[in-house]
């Protein structure tokens, strides 16, 4: 680009052509010493020593493979022989008439209260009307009561019989006369076998029928 501009200026007469010719020459002069310096910096090749040429490295041999030791068999022992697999034992034929022994297990007999006869009776010998509480508690618990009023006077015996009649009426039971002064009070849930049933009435005297 700069060279074309200078040529144009020389062509127009604005620049001197000698200066243009001297500039490439000066550039060549500056480049020449540089080339010499570069050549001077090259190291001199060393002289070859004839003894060095004679010496050659010995060839490196590959290491020989190590020998594998043979397996040593201990003295007095023989090589193991292949073991044949054992065959499963055949099941012995079973006698069709054989039966395994059975041990019977004893079971406790189940006790059931349903349908069982009543073996418990409560016998009361009242000495006063205050013993009516014991009669009422036994009858209310479902136990038949035999009431013997022979040790009471007529008035107290009548009061106690009236109390028993009201008791069995309120609890839907029954009262029956065994003797003139002995009465059986039966709850509604109990059936006494062998006793004659009679109607209970507070108006009846315990001494009727004597």
Curated annotation (Swiss-Prot):
- Annotated Gene3D superfamilies: SepF-like protein
Query: Matching InterPro entries, A to Z?
Result: Cell_div_SepF, Cell_div_SepF/SepF-rel, SepF-like_sf
> Where does it mainly reside?
cytoplasm
- Keyword annotations for this protein? Cell cycle, Cell division, Cytoplasm, Septation
The residue ranges flagged as biased composition, category Basic and acidic residues, are 22-70, 83-93
* Cellular-component GO terms for this entry: cytoplasm
* One Pfam family matching this protein: SepF
Keyword presence, Cell cycle: yes
Residues annotated as region Disordered? 13-101
- Would the keyword Nucleotide-binding turn up in this protein's UniProt record? no
Q: Where does the UniProt annotation locate this protein?
A: Cytoplasm
> Could you describe the subunit structure of this protein?
Homodimer. Interacts with FtsZ.
Q: What's this chain's function?
A: Cell division protein that is part of the divisome complex and is recruited early to the Z-ring. Probably stimulates Z-ring formation, perhaps through the cross-linking of FtsZ protofilaments. Its function overlaps with FtsA.
UniProt similarity note: Belongs to the SepF family.
Protein's UniProt name: Cell division protein SepF
